[in-house]
């Protein structure tokens, strides 16, 4: 098989990557096949069925074409791509395969963000959307996310159906794609008009309203991704000009030269921003990840001190400040959060008389619930968020949307600044009045086949053993979403969980929870801690050492 792939290497788009890889890395591309998971496909570049290249991308496109042609007539699809290596080329490969199978592909001629893709699907009323991105993964990764006609990522049932079509294609080397330029000429491939972007901007500006105070200077960085110049254009059109772009870090570049990892969850990504803040006397640094679905920020205050806010804290701030922003609107509000989001979010929502809705991890579940909630005209969304720095205030899109959140944060920062208040003081006020939960997320990595077995062993051991105490804390309940049951560890009584089944276990204590699940896109196990304790770091270290690393 490898020889046949090598014969076609010039058409693979990844020849240069392959030739710089070690023999072990090259061989890994022929061990198994890429699987379309709950978050689509994400992988490193390389030759072979287990890596991203022109042929495996065509395979996904053909599977999607077969899936759509089976379910709808005259299907159409929007395709966007980010600033990563080969993103544009992959988008054209997919468009050609779709067009060759009778599906109209609407593509962008320049990089776009994930929230723009979600909005475009809804705005253009197409049957599906494709986003070529690996979000905040390292530079040697890329990926494909598929969206349904509502603009949300595919739910498990649809994802499984699509996966069956993709997996049924045995020889991706033989997939016909037709001529891209010919399809453009005959209209099967169309370039998206600027009207879509303008409509999206209009919706975002409507959400923000106006930015009346302008004294707080803000630094923006796209981490070499897609949020600029769109965000700066929106701010300018809102007549807010007191921002500075970190130019070196905002050049579109899939090599991500100024950061080790282009992830606003990583405080190290703000190094250049902090240096620029020192020079410009800016009070806030906002960073978005490469496909602009996630954001993070650091506040500069006092005598040149900096405060980094984690994903839960940003969500809490947005909840409180947006609630205050909507005080003149008497419409009942609801919020949505994932089950691994801070316990403090529910307490804050309850104190604000806001309805709380829990969903599984993955913004697709938030999107699906919003779709149902939107049919209820009596309630409006306050905020939907996950602890992993993903937020949505106005459901103009159906995925995490950093583009709409940046100008909202700028507005709130200036309103606070006008009253001599900082984000730091605001979050401390929440802790003082609502409770001081400390939240941490760890993601130990276990590479290769041995890593897969290790992660399976960890989940199996926690699932099959009776656990009454963890790190000195009594376990009150164990929620096992894989079997769909919650067990009361005091009475032994079990009940059915109401949320869909997924590979996640959550241990409930009197003072919070610890949860764990395998990552859907990387060889990692995600560990979530939300506890009302002082020694959170001691607990996380003890848990990882005694309950994760010791399991064989």
UniProtKB/Swiss-Prot annotation:
Cofactor(s) in the UniProt record: Mg(2+)
Co-factor binding comment: Binds 1 Mg(2+) ion per subunit.
Domain of life: Bacteria
GO terms of biological process kind: enterobacterial common antigen biosynthetic process; glucose metabolic process; purine ribonucleoside salvage
UniProt xrefs under InterPro entries: A-D-PHexomutase_a/b/a-I (IPR005844), A-D-PHexomutase_a/b/a-I/II/III (IPR016055), A-D-PHexomutase_a/b/a-II (IPR005845), A-D-PHexomutase_a/b/a-III (IPR005846), A-D-PHexomutase_C (IPR005843), A-D-PHexomutase_C_sf (IPR036900), A-D-PHexomutase_CS (IPR016066), Alpha-D-phosphohexomutase_SF (IPR005841)
Broad enzyme group: isomerase
UniProt binding sites for Mg(2+): 135, 289, 291, 293
Pfam families xrefs: PGM_PMM_I, PGM_PMM_II, PGM_PMM_III, PGM_PMM_IV
Pathway: Glycolipid metabolism; diglucosyl-diacylglycerol biosynthesis
Entry annotated with the keyword Glycoprotein: no
E.C. numbers: 5.4.2.2
Catalytic center residues: 135
Reaction equations catalysed: alpha-D-glucose 1-phosphate = alpha-D-glucose 6-phosphate
Span of the signal peptide: none
GO molecular function: magnesium ion binding; phosphoglucomutase activity; phosphopentomutase activity
Keywords, sorted A to Z: Carbohydrate metabolism, Glucose metabolism, Isomerase, Magnesium, Metal-binding, Phosphoprotein
Family affiliation: Belongs to the phosphohexose mutase family.
Its job: Catalyzes the interconversion between glucose-6-phosphate and alpha-glucose-1-phosphate. This is the first step in the biosynthesis of diglucosyl-diacylglycerol (Glc2-DAG), i.e. a glycolipid found in the membrane, which is also used as a membrane anchor for lipoteichoic acid (LTA).
Cross-referenced PANTHER family: PHOSPHOGLUCOMUTASE 2B-RELATED, PHOSPHOMANNOMUTASE 45A
Descriptive protein name: Phosphoglucomutase
Originating organism: Staphylococcus saprophyticus subsp. saprophyticus (strain ATCC 15305 / DSM 20229 / NCIMB 8711 / NCTC 7292 / S-41)
